[in-house]
Structure formats: C-alpha cells, structure tokens
Amino acid sequence: MTWTPPEPMLSAPLPGPELRPGWAAEPKWDGFRALVSVDAGRVVLRSRRGTEMLPAFPEIGAGASRLPDATALDGELVVWDAAGRLAFEQLQSRLQRRGAGAGRAAYEWPAHFVAFDLLRLSGTDTTGWPYRRRRAALESVFTARRLSAPWVLCPSTTDPDTVREWLTWASVGIEGVLFKRLDSVYEPAVRGWRKYKVRETTEAIVSAATGTLAAPRTLLLGRFDDRGRLQYVGRTTTPTLRASSTVTGLLTPARRGHPWTGWSFSAGWGSRETLDTTLVEPELVAEVGVDVARDASGRWRHPARWHRARPDLSPTEVPQFES
C-alpha cells in the first residue's frame, strides 16, 4: 500500500518569544517548507501546497538514498550563500530549473533540507507520537545514518537562553522561533504550533504612494545609498484610517526632478504587475516595523507595518540603504 505524505502541520503567531514550560523551540528558517519521503527507492519532495519539487532539487533526491527506507521528514529547504546567510532569492530562482539546468544550479547554489520533524520511520507512521518522541527518533536517524549535506538537523531546545540567542541571528536570515508542545502529536493542516517572527522597528523616507494623496492605500519607502541616491527599499501595508489622515497632511506632491521619475514598481515580490503610483517629495520620515527577509538588492521582501510618521526626523537621519 502506497503511503501518502500528510498535509504539513501549521503554526499560529505569538506576540512574544517567551518559551513556556512543556514546550520546545526551534529556529524559524527563511526557506521553502517541504516534506520528503523515500519508499522502495521512490523519492517524493513536496511543497506545503503539494507541488512536486524534486526535479528542481536533484541533490535532495540523491541524498535520500542515505535515509532509512519507508521514512518521511518534515522540514525546510534552504540555500546558504558564501557568507553563511540564507539566500531565499537564489532558492526561489531554482524552482523553474529542470534537467541540466537544475544540475548546474545544484552545483552553484546547493540546497539543504533542514529536518525538524519525523512523520514516518521504516514503515511506521509516527505522526501519532508526541513531539519529544518524534524528536528523539529524528536525532537517532541523523546519528545512526551519519547524515550530512544536504541533510541538516534543525536545532531544538527547552532552554530560554538559547531561544534568546537565536533571536540575535536575524542578520543571517533566521526569521524567528517556532514553539512546539512536547506532548503534542503531529496534526496535519492544524495550527497547533506557535511562531514568533523577528521584526525590527526602523525608519525610511516616504517617496511615493498608491491610491491618492488624500487617501493613500500604501506608501513606497526609500533610503539614500552611500552615493546619495534614493533607493527603493519597500512599501507599507495599508495604513489605518487614522494614520492615513495624519500622513495626508504631511505629503507634498513631487516637483520636477524626483529621483524616481520614470520608475515602475512591482505589485508584489515575484509579480509582473506594476503599481499605479504618485510620487511625493522625499521629505517625510516614517517609522515602520519590518521583518528580516531581504532580497538580493537589499529590499524588504515583505510589506512594512506602519507605526507612525516622524516629522521630527530628517531624511539624512534615516539608516543608509545597504544592498
């Protein structure tokens, strides 16, 4: 009888990173959620949505020969750059590669599978086991099989000090922390885990808007680079009505010579749709909440959360754009 991988277990957000008694914590990786299974030599590598990804990541298929037969792992596909940072953009660029192109990409930007859960072991369904038992069995697989790249064992801890240390790893691409109850079973498609995503508050310059200046829907943000050029760094989520009304009185339509004249902006990361924007004078500083994910150009990959306008700050006081 063919074993079908279950839907992945999911997580719900937490407002803070406190590790509670009876729970374990793991780093949250900036990659692609994936399930990998091997059964009688047949390897399956599926995305969170059930898409087969093995043709794009042949090194995972080759490495699966070192796993016990009739075994399945839950984890995250990641790519590290030469500096040891997670390179999400390179990971995503590999999705469309096939055949020789996928092989070249595997050599240039090898993917790793960071395993954080065990769903099946040598034909035994382990999803009904408590997390602590699944975790111990997963560690035993890595030890007994002496697994190395492309396999990586995700750290797990019950020590709050270790969690605090992980939260300082944002610069290398750790998105936050996942929390799992030690006695919890693996529940497909259920948000039984908890997650805390690292976000930082920072400043940027409001340089354009979507919608109208009387009622902006989103604000496009910039920062000056080391040569004094205003670079696009990201855009906000939709401000609240109160925030929108406050911002409206602080925006000045752009005069001639705006540095973004003639530019177009994508409606979303990876989207070909462009935004209909109105340029404004790059004078107003905004305080925003952003997470750690950046693209290769140094832009925020996810929308920034509007906190407040900072008319008390000059654009020259905003952190410099870093690519």
Identify the residue ranges that each predicted region occupies.
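Catalytic cores of nucleic-acid ligases and guanylyltransferases
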Residues: M1-S323
